[in-house]
């Protein structure tokens, strides 16, 4: 429907789709955090590690950078039992959900059988399972392998509770929470919205401004005209 330029009835909630109207960025963030921390795990039995928050943009109150800070505070707060490392402005803590943001063919890993190999790739998502501040490394569990990161390599990791829609391409998640608030026009395209909603396997929740979704559906020509580079530059300045 969206891909054909048709407007769904966002007022019709169903078993696999819900719309929560939040016109202010702060209330949108609060709702997303509450959904991830309590409402979906308790009411729908979907654990937080099977929920993916998506946003068109990195920047702004409802962008992924701020969402990840808020979600880390709610889902993996500081604890004496969890070691952490401050890298730039980012705190990496045992238990954090992280994503590899560039191909690295030299990272050493071991699989569950103890077999060693090398290489972690852009878009791989895992969990920090060990933070060794004395030896200065993190271990990240990517489900099929555990990779070792020296602290000097932490610029290759970002938190991954919230991802941009662009970074989610090619992946699917049990539940998707989509943050929709005004950002740069070239990020609000039909293609971005279609990509976001098709990431959800069982449940999609839109949180934000319905008008943004309608604008995205109508913005088809622009999605063709702007290059990926221009979209990325717009995101960096939003």
Model segments located where?
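Conserved helicase motor core of P-loop NTPases
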Residues: 1-118
């Amino acid at each position: 429907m969206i891909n054909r330029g048709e407007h769904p009835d966002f007022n019709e909630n169903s078993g696999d789709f819900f719309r929560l109207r939040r016109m202010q960025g702060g209330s949108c963030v609060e709702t997303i955090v509450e959904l991830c921390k309590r409402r979906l795990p308790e009411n729908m039995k979907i654990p937080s590690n099977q929920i993916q928050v998506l946003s068109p943009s990195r920047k702004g109150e409802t962008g992924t950078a701020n969402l990840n800070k808020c979600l880390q505070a709610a889902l993996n707060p500081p604890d004496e039992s969890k070691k952490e490392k401050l890298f730039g402005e980012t705190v990496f803590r045992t238990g954090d959900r992280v994503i590899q943001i560039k191909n690295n063919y030299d990272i050493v890993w071991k699989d569950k059988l103890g077999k060693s190999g090398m290489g972690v790739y852009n878009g791989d998502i895992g969990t920090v399972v060990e933070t060794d501040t004395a030896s200065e490394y993190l271990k990240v569990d990517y489900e099929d392998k555990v990779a070792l990161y020296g602290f000097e390599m932490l610029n290759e990791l970002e938190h991954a509770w919230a991802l941009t829609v662009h970074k989610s391409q090619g992946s699917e998640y049990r539940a998707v929470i989509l943050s929709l608030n005004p950002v740069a026009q070239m990020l609000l395209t039909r293609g971005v919205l279609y990509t976001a909603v098709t990431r959800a396997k069982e449940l999609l929740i839109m949180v934000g401004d319905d008008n943004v979704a309608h604008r995205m559906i109508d913005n088809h020509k622009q999605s063709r005209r702007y290059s990926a580079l221009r979209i990325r530059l717009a995101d960096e300045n939003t």
